[in-house]
């Protein structure tokens, strides 16, 4: 792995979210050349969710937003969001294996998806509608969940597609 920090590599340019939030930013540009060079030498870039504005001020960025912005910029086929939840759950708290934009909006309207899961799902929908074929939310607390997602037909967690 290779650690990517904003000060060292400056791969994420941000704009401030708002004055009320202080040093919280939204990505406006991802410099993919640095990431592509790291990937070419078979290393995995581990990116801190920090970016710099036009004045080189450091801003914090939501990690899911950074991951989505990088996936879109790299034109990734799939994005995995590793979380502390199984994925999207139905009313009976059972895992929903796959949802699309329409189903996600229905689940939000029905308040099945609520709270902090709403911005996570909205980010996933944005990523899926901007060139990434699918975003999966998987439970990082489960042993081998990433391998299960990558190497099985069934997958792990909830797959979100356009």
Positions of PLM-derived features:
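Low-complexity, intrinsically disordered Gly/Pro/Thr-rich segments
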Residues: 141-148
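Conserved, well-ordered active-site substructure
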Residues: 97-99, 148-162
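Nucleotide/pyrophosphate-binding catalytic subdomain
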Residues: 1-141, 154
